[in-house]
């Protein structure tokens, strides 16, 4: 009797459901990644555009949550991990690609749809100048309410000039909706919201799927700058580092030469400038006691010269702090770590 009851129960299952479960089971087994997206508020007719974009990369299926659960169990997935996401109308994306990159596609890929009552404008909604193709009649009063200047020409309504009917953040006027539809204007952006990804046994909620590429890029650049600074300090022997190291060593050598008075063609200017500065300082100190017969620069001139010299030193320090440019960061990564 139990077998008969089971057989009768099995006969009641529609054949299309059995085929659907079989197909879903195979898709689950052959995919590295499964993403579940919400269809609430998303126009079902827009899925074909996503299918076209992902052709060859992913398979998109709209099916009942119960059928997916059965298929997932058949494929050996612990469905309890995904149970909380299997509510409401869902779409299932099967792919062999990385879940983060696949989610990035859905984050960035926006589709347009016609406005509905209560929709807010994300950008200016403009009724363009020109022939609307609409026959003159009651529609003229609607244009009037929207403060759109019109004229009738050959029995058709013509808009005199481009007119903004909603600014970003404004609710799109209800009166404008039929006009926008007739003109083929789709002012509302929609995107498929991914709830979760299942990747090789790992459940990844939507909030953990988002990649902060700018943050990663900034961190890598900062890490490279720090590594480059260290490499310059220890004179790490690669061409892109050594040109900075040699320049720094040369500057330090000139500074030391000017301090000890070591004269070479390269250090002559620094040594003489240092000596002149010391001589002026000494002369200024004793000028009140001894008549040197030499006109000394005023305190203001001396201060200006010192300020200029200090500014140049600060500029040099800033240049050293800045380190390599963005181009040098890009080209230097390979030579420093490769």
UniProtKB/Swiss-Prot annotation:
Keyword terms, alphabetized: Ribonucleoprotein, Ribosomal protein, RNA-binding, rRNA-binding
Ranges of compositional bias, category Basic and acidic residues: 309-325
SUPFAM superfamilies linked: Ribosomal protein L10-like
Biased composition (Low complexity): 298-308
InterPro entries per the UniProt record, alphabetical: Ribosomal_protein_uL10, Ribosomal_uL10, Ribosomal_uL10-like_insert, Ribosomal_uL10-like_insert_sf, Ribosomal_uL10-like_sf, Ribosomal_uL10_arc
GO process annotations (BP): cytoplasmic translation; ribosomal large subunit assembly
GO molecular function, one term: structural constituent of ribosome
Sequence segments annotated as region (Disordered): 297-338
GO CC annotations, alphabetized: cytosolic large ribosomal subunit
Pfam families associated with the record: Ribosomal_L10, RL10P_insert
Entry superkingdom: Archaea
Subunit field text: Part of the 50S ribosomal subunit. Forms part of the ribosomal stalk which helps the ribosome interact with GTP-bound translation factors. Forms a heptameric L10(L12)2(L12)2(L12)2 complex, where L10 forms an elongated spine to which the L12 dimers bind in a sequential fashion.
Similarity annotation: Belongs to the universal ribosomal protein uL10 family.
Function comment: Forms part of the ribosomal stalk, playing a central role in the interaction of the ribosome with GTP-bound translation factors.
Protein name: Large ribosomal subunit protein uL10
Record gene name: rpl10
């Amino acid at each position: 009797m139990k077998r008969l009851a089971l057989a009768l129960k099995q006969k009641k299952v529609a054949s299309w459901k059995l085929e659907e479960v079989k197909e879903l089971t195979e898709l689950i087994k052959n995919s590295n990644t499964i993403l579940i997206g919400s269809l609430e508020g998303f126009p079902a007719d827009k899925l074909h555009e996503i299918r076209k974009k992902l052709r060859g990369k992913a398979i998109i299926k709209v099916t009942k949550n119960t059928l997916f659960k059965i298929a997932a169990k058949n494929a050996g997935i612990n469905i309890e991990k995904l149970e909380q996401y299997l509510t409401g109308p869902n779409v299932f994306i099967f792919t062999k690609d990385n879940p983060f990159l696949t989610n990035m596609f859905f984050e960035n890929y926006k589709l347009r749809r016609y406005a509905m009552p209560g929709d807010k404008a994300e950008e200016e909604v403009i009724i363009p100048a020109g022939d609307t193709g609409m026959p003159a009649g009651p529609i003229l009063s609607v244009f009037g309410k929207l403060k759109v200047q019109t004229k009738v020409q050959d029995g058709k309504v013509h808009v005199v000039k481009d007119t903004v009917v909603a600014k970003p953040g404004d609710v799109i006027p209800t009166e404008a909706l039929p006009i926008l539809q007739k003109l083929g204007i789709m002012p509302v952006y929609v995107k498929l919201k991914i709830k979760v990804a299942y990747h090789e046994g790992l459940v990844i909620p939507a909030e953990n799927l988002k990649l902060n590429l700018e943050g990663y890029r900034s961190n890598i650049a900062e890490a490279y700058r720090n590594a480059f600074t260290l490499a310059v300090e220890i004179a790490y022997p690669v061409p892109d580092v050594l040109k900075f190291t040699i320049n720094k060593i040369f500057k330090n050598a000139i500074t030391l030469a000017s301090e000890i008075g070591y004269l070479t063609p390269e250090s002559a200017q620094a040594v003489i400038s240092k000596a002149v500065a010391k001589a002026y300082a000494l002369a200024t100190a004793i000028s009140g006691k001894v008549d040197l017969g030499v006109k000394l620069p005023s305190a203001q001139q001396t201060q200006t010269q010192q300020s200029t010299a200090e500014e140049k030193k600060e500029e040099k320090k800033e240049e050293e702090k800045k380190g390599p440019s963005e181009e040098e960061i890009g080209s230097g990564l390979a030579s420093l770590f490769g």
